[in-house]
């Protein structure tokens, strides 16, 4: 049976295997985050075969880099690692709430209902635009210990997971923006090129 994010968080709080790191910005992030225009963002990520300490160390460094950049989600391809690994923390102001680590995530069900919400991305700093996505999802994944999990998510969590999972296929949120004029202006205003966008069909 699929569990909600809240249930997963409570389970992680009871577990000694949590990979949580201090939710504080560092003077220098351990990993560089690639930005729009870098080829590193456009490849397909590989599934992770063995979940070991190396994977957990990467997840920790991703979290440290994410907190340093004041983000709520980060995918491994954004730091130049083409593996199917995501870290998410929507409650970064609460130290006791563990982050969510998703390894080899697969969305199994999407809601028929969709909503529109403004998105941003650590790989396109300063740019915020509306994107349409399914309101709710169900997914399967492995946690930081390699255990198989399922969960349901809606609202911001569902959107964040979908956004980060796009990175595993070389897709950026700007590829989904339908307001071409607004997109071009936002990108130009923040030093990015519209030619680096690869529009996809919603």
From Swiss-Prot:
Question: Which lineage do the record's taxonomy fields give for this organism?
Answer: Bacteria, Bacillati, Cyanobacteriota, Cyanophyceae, Synechococcales
> Mind listing the UniProt keywords for this protein, alphabetically?
Hydrolase, Iron, Metal-binding, Protein biosynthesis
UniProt GO MF annotations: metal ion binding; peptide deformylase activity
Q: Which cofactor does it need?
A: Fe(2+)
Q: Where does Fe cation bind?
A: 121, 163, 167
Primary enzyme class: hydrolase
Main function: Removes the formyl group from the N-terminal Met of newly synthesized proteins. Requires at least a dipeptide for an efficient rate of reaction. N-terminal L-methionine is a prerequisite for activity but the enzyme has broad specificity at other positions.
Kindly indicate whether the keyword Zinc belongs to this entry.
no
Catalytic residue list: 164
Q: Does the entry feature the keyword Mitochondrion, yes or no?
A: no
**A single GO BP annotation from the record?**
translation
Instruction: List the protein's name.
Output: Peptide deformylase
The entry's family comment says:
Belongs to the polypeptide deformylase family.
Origin organism of this chain?
A: Synechococcus sp. (strain CC9311)
Which reaction is catalysed here?
Answer: N-terminal N-formyl-L-methionyl-[peptide] + H2O = N-terminal L-methionyl-[peptide] + formate
Which note does the record give on the cofactor?
A: Binds 1 Fe(2+) ion.
Q: What is its EC number?
A: 3.5.1.88
Q: Name one Pfam family in it.
A: Pep_deformylase
